[in-house]
Amino acid sequence: MHPANRRRGRAPLLTVVVLPICLVVVAACAPAASQPSPATTQAQVRPVATSGLSPTTAPTRRPQSTPLEPDPAQVRLRLDSVATGLDRPVFATDAGDGSGRLFVVEKGGTIRILDGGRLLARPFLDIRDRVLSRGSEQGLLGLAFAPDFQRSGYFYVDYIDRSGNTVISRFQAGKSANSADSGSEFKVLGIDQPASNHNGGMLAFGPDGYLYVGTGDGGREGDPFHNGQNPQTLLGKLLRLDVTTDPTKPYTIPPSNPWVTAKYNGQAVLPEIWAIGLRNPWRFSFDRKTGDLWIGDVGQNTYEEIDRIAAGAGGRVQGGLNFGWSIMEGMHCYPDTATCSRAGLTLPVAEYTHGADGCSITGGYVYRGTAIPGLVGAYIYGDYCSGRIWALTPAAGGAWQSQLLLDSGLAISSFGQDQAGELYVVDLGGAVYRLA
């Protein structure tokens, strides 16, 4: 997750292949409303031009000849409050059941429901008795509904148990549509944690129907346990599990996982692993139109990074990649005094340095809604420390450029996406906002 003590007042240079031009902030978000009914904030900014492609290449705008091109510079973004009074919310998602409900994960161990703009008083799930949330990166951290949730009632959570270890469990909705059976817990996977931070926590079903799990490197500083590049640990990885083919088993290994039979640099790899070399992939998502995978991987002392895996045939992403940690932090050798080889590594599509703009990336989603046409196809992400929100879009020459959309002033713990493709900002301080 993110630091407990937010470090504000440091500006990142949004790097697209190489270091770009610094962004400018011109407005901030007003405080959240005091009641859960929808209310428009006063958060609006004037868009500004951003990132060049290299020190010698001027920024190039993509032609705006078609409305299908994302055009963040024309967007006047605001945040509409949809819920307040939450207890340290860290995620929001829909169930894919057509109900229009939004499910909000609270760090302490509860899941709340937003239904028709109203925050229901009774939690959908309450497992506070099983969750350790004392540490800043501990708690109930992730939620994913099974693709067949409407039929099976199954959903999956990622939490830190009372012993300080990661647990991924399946639960089932109860007789009421707005409550789950806390006694239905079926443990899918447990991972021992050597420290209290870098716990990952994101769960998401991919277009292939498999459950993807993001794990941190085990914590402390600089990967002292050497987990990022260790193929014999599940820490510092992206996992891919089949949890739906046989619901009587915790999971099975998809036969197409990259290291079921193959080795990595001559070493055997745990078959659950889909990709290696991640530090703390706190939030990742799949583009619901293309199937592309986007990862916001929280950096160490200097760089925050965005990784993208373009989907291939059938809208599926390639496994077997190494995102570099702790050989590299972002696009740079780690530590910065070291020399390293990039051979065999998948580098980020964008990075930014720690500074006034932030210190801890919060990965988001490619916008596929209808309320903000200028953002369709843009990857929306933010920073927990600064509260800034950006749009990342393709630029000339296969590079990427970032556009500052808003300086929200919020502790952005997550973004959320509803069934219509509209996006939400989750504020750890206790509120959820809709991008509008």
Which residue stretches match the model-derived regions?
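Acidic, Gly/Ser/Thr-rich repeat motifs that build Ca2+-stabilized beta-propeller blades
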Residues: 47, 52-222, 283-286, 291-302, ...
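Blade/loop signatures of beta-propeller domains
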Residues: 52-78, 119, 177-181, 248-266, ...
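Conserved blade-ending motifs and adjacent loop-strand segments that build the rim/top face
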Residues: 278, 399-419
